[in-house]
Amino acid sequence: MFVVSEMADFIKAGGLGDVAAALPRALRHRYDVRVLIPGYRAVLARAGKVEIVGRVLAHAALPACDIGRIVQSDGLPIYILLSKELFERDGSPYVSTSGSEFEDNAIRFATLSHAAAQIAAGRAGLGWRPRLLHLNDWPCALAAAYVRWSGGTTPCLLTIHNLAYQGLVPYSMAAALGIPAERVSELEFYGQMSFLRGGIVHADHVNTVSVSYAQQITGPAQGCGLDRLLAGRAAKGALSGIVNGIDASWDPRTDEYLDSHFSVNHWQGRQANAAQVRKAFGLRESTGPLFAVVSRLVHQKGLDLICEVAPQIVAAGGQIAVIGGGEPEIEQQVAELTRRYPGQVGAFIGFEEGLARRMFAGADFLLMPSRFEPCGLSQMYAQRFGCLPIAHATGGLIDTVDDGVTGFLFQQASAEALRRCLERAFRTFRLPSLLSAMRRAAMLRPSGWDVAGKKYISLYERTAATAPAVATVS
């Protein structure tokens, strides 16, 4: 059972939602995969008629909840954890419409985790038990602990999509969350409790969304205070990485958001898309390179570095189109660039799916100087559409961008390193045959979920074989 706090079919706050929509479907040819997700207002609005099929009992301060069931049009079964009190509210899965975290997030997601453990134990009245729990990020991580604390043996795989988010709560909430007093130390994190730490301790296997990120989080620079614990899991062969895939709908030959389609053998549509992007962002007609930024406008994504090198890009004849939202200070810096370089730098503060896809389909290069990146999806979307990533060599960017072949990598997260990498990109742009060869290589790079799915099948079997009571995944 795939346990998740967001799913793009219903509600999405980040890349996890895309993974939750794609990976279970990629595995259905092999397993009876079912998804468990909270019954947010947005989920219920899109679910249609929900059949009540089970119930989980209250535990400490965690309320009893009904379990609803729907079946997607492609046959994927979805279990929905129903609670008006906890989940039926406006906002994203984690924050209110004002942008502040819900104060009861610990109760909300402990309830989700406990429900998963109860389903695994066959105590929810479903008439079905999963042979493995696949848990995703801190909102679901505590399920592995609940399983073990109750004496359960269901194999648990925990996937870390971003280690920076750990689900930190005060010790004073231990009793309310149903955490045994003698077990609190297993969640200890610098004077607080961490849901994610509990999952790392108790899951049979932990994986991340890229091979390089799995290696990097075992060191202090990117371990977010959990590096020693993760290094210990790695030493026992219980930490690995699998690069995410991207959905098959990202196809420049058929994408519904594109007016002009193209392929590796017929490039003409890219020029038409570039013209559309320039018009949408108020950029002048140009024969120079077009650089896209499709990102949250936050420090982690290196947007301050882009703002620092923007004058050099413009001076060299390039143009920049930015879409995204985030930290007010960086939004203001981007707005200032558009005022300083009218017709050369344009921005859309917010997000619009169709516009983002047209940017990938029309821009020559994608700027992605992330300081850390567990996997990253934008670089793979860009490659699929023949837009070459210019990326900092970290995490999943190392695993997905072949320097000088399917994009460009720079080693240090600094403006100077980015400038030197941009010089390489400009030289490539002036060599049409090399540019075309790199675009072709990028578009042909295997990045579908079929590749990642096969690796998850192997990981499921390995996780089941090393669990306390050996189980066969089915």
UniProtKB/Swiss-Prot annotation:
GO terms for molecular function: alpha-1,4-glucan glucosyltransferase (ADP-glucose donor) activity; alpha-1,4-glucan glucosyltransferase (UDP-glucose donor) activity. It is an enzyme of class 2 (transferase). Keywords: Glycogen biosynthesis, Glycosyltransferase, Transferase. Pfam families: Glyco_transf_5, Glycos_transf_1. It comes from the Bacteria. Its EC number is 2.4.1.21. Pathway: Glycan biosynthesis; glycogen biosynthesis. InterPro entries: Glyco_trans_1, GS/SS, Starch_synth_cat_dom. The keyword Transferase applies. ADP-alpha-D-glucose binds at K12. It catalyses: [(1->4)-alpha-D-glucosyl](n) + ADP-alpha-D-glucose = [(1->4)-alpha-D-glucosyl](n+1) + ADP + H(+). GO terms for biological process: glycogen biosynthetic process. Belongs to the glycosyltransferase 1 family. Bacterial/plant glycogen synthase subfamily. NCBIfam families: glgA, PRK00654.1-2, PRK00654.1-5. Synthesizes alpha-1,4-glucan chains using ADP-glucose. This is Glycogen synthase. It comes from Xanthomonas campestris pv. campestris (strain ATCC 33913 / DSM 3586 / NCPPB 528 / LMG 568 / P 25).
